Amino acid sequence: MTPPPEDIMMRILQINLGHCRAAQDLLLQVVREKGADVVIVSEQWKGSGAGWYANADDTAAICLPNKRAAKWHTQVGCGWVWVEMSGVRIYSCYFSPNSTQQDFLGEISNLERDI
């Protein structure tokens, strides 16, 4: 991974939407108002097309609403997704509190191997 340039600054927001459509709509408005480059999301309503990168079960996502925040790479795992941009890898993770301890430890182990 290449080190980020010194003069790059990203505005990053993080939120758990609880699978609520109204919360996601409000988030998109806040993103526009604040000029966010990256939004790390858990339990999104659903991906909103271009600029959204989600794991297979739509529990973790990263939204890149700003066109200048171009992604370089992305990867999806069980409970997580990452996007690499400007030499920085950003993860969004969600592990259900209803998972068994065995499932949770397996998911954490998979994430740890990826990092």
Predicted regions and their residues:
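A shared catalytic/ligand-binding motif for oxyanion handling
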Residues: 1-115
